[in-house]
Amino acid sequence: MSDYKIWVDADACPNPIKEILFRAAERKALPLVLVANQMIRVPPSPYISQVRVGVGFDVADQYIVDHVEPTHLVITADIPLAALIIEKGALALNPRGELYTVDNIKQKLTMRDFMEDLRGSGVHTGGPDSFSQADKQAFANSLDKWLVRV
């Protein structure tokens, strides 16, 4: 099991997702690393750690990319980061339980870029729906599917 690890792009990760991850790390004795540019509260555990990176654009993302390995799972809502993780052969899961894959990442990037272009031209596109109990459950289910394999 020592080859497996979970990385968290922690600055924007919802607290309920972190709690699920903390419990999973303890239950499976699995390394969990939260990467952020601010201090993140983590429970005392030999399996849970945090890395505080400097402030700057995509500094936490780059740290994760530099350290991820193919047997790792990365939790992120950042689609460009997910694309880089997939390129390195690892898995990326968003906090709403959606697994980013080789098959869907290009479409996700295209849609993200399109929405960014719309916002840049002054069109109000709205944001994602509020994080819900259904999202939390979908994440827990997806994480459990990965944990069964480790």
Swiss-Prot record:
Pfam families: DUF188. InterPro entries: UPF0178. Belongs to the UPF0178 family. NCBIfam families: PRK00124.1 (NF001095). This is UPF0178 protein Shew185_1764. It comes from Shewanella baltica (strain OS185).
